[in-house]
Amino acid sequence: STALVQLREAKQLNRVGVILSSYLTNEDLYAAKRIFGELGATQVVFQRPPSGSHDDFLIQADKSPNAKGAQALGIAEGAEELLEEAAKGELRVLLVFTQDLVPLFTEELVQAAAKALELFVFVGTNANPTAALAHLVLPSAVYAEKDGTFTNFQGRVQRIHAALDPWGESRPDWAILGDLAEALGLSTRCVYAPSIFAELAKTERPFQGMSYQTIGDQGALLKQ
């Protein structure tokens, strides 16, 4: 957070990059959008994993659960440009959530970015090549340890329920983001998933009128 405070004071938040993931819940994504928006960091994108086998009917190429949710929240897609900026020394801080970038963009590019950055943070559930290159790694909870929602490829918002407590020091991404907001003195608060979704449903038009109760077991379609 110290590096972000320094960049804010120097009016250099254009040199902060944030790469979110389509594996994050709607609550995680919204928390990131709100917090980095309040901070004034505008270079916030999401990245899908590599495409898998598909038939474009029942089997989708995108194996992640929430690209549609990221799009509905108005988050731009694609991490390559930010990585290239980082490798050229145009960014000073880069935060990456969940997605291993090495299989998508080569180890050489991610390594060059890591060397050029003042601070490279990876928030994720598993050890991977991107985490190995990061300067700081924060453990996050897997989906089985989270409450929240995903939006499937048809635009149906669906509930997930935590089956387990987060392992060790890991926590939901929205909670990690909430700590960052508090450390930066921001007004955005991330206390628990239901309150984040309630705010999301008030402020994001595609989700308006939804609640965990109305989503229920069947899900609810995004508004067009």
PLM regions: where:
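Catalytic-loop motifs flanking and including active-site residues across diverse enzymes
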Residues: 172-176
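Catalytic or ion-translocation cores adjacent to nucleophile or general acid/base/metal-coordination motifs
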Residues: 147-161
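A short glycine-threonine-serine/GTX helix/turn-capping micro-motif
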Residues: 162-170
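Short, charged, surface-exposed loops that flank catalytic or proteolytic processing sites
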Residues: 169, 189-193
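Catalytic alpha/large subunits of respiratory electron-transfer oxidoreductases
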Residues: 1-146, 162, 180-190, 201-224
